[in-house]
Amino acid sequence: MGRISSGGMMFKAITTVAALVIATSAMAQDDLTISSLAKGETTKAAFNQMVQGHKLPAWVMKGGTYTPAQTVTLGDETYQVMSACKPHDCGSQRIAVMWSEKSNQMTGLFSTIDEKTSQEKLTWLNVNDALSIDGKTVLFAALTGSLENHPDGFNFK
């Protein structure tokens, strides 16, 4: 058997640590959901402010069928963007949320489809003036799947 030099052992150790850091970071992003934002100690207040004055269905808090969070940059602010839909009926109700950990700001878009008319109703949640155009573009892209299909296409300076 060959010997492993101390340099080789160091490389293996660094590689192992790097793999764990990457896996932990990816797992943390994958674990970020709209329902976890609604219930989280540091995010609950921002979520409640976002939905204030709106009655959302229970599945939003309990957890729907969701997509993993994606990172989007608007200006100099970085956001985690995620979406979810009503379990077993994704076509009828969907929600997309943008959250900035830096400013602890949250904004969203809720969509319902009228079964009789097939018309979609969009409800904007806590969209401030700074986010009005680009933020709405990103939220709608998350809602429709465009953000997931083109993740680098929605970063705006």
UniProtKB/Swiss-Prot annotation:
Single GO cellular component term: outer membrane-bounded periplasmic space
GO MF term list: lysozyme inhibitor activity; protein homodimerization activity
UniProt keyword Lipid biosynthesis present: no
Source domain of life: Bacteria
Annotated disulfide bonds: 85-90
Main location: periplasm
Job description of the protein: Strong inhibitor of lysozyme C.
Official protein name in the record: Inhibitor of vertebrate lysozyme
Organism: Escherichia coli (strain K12)
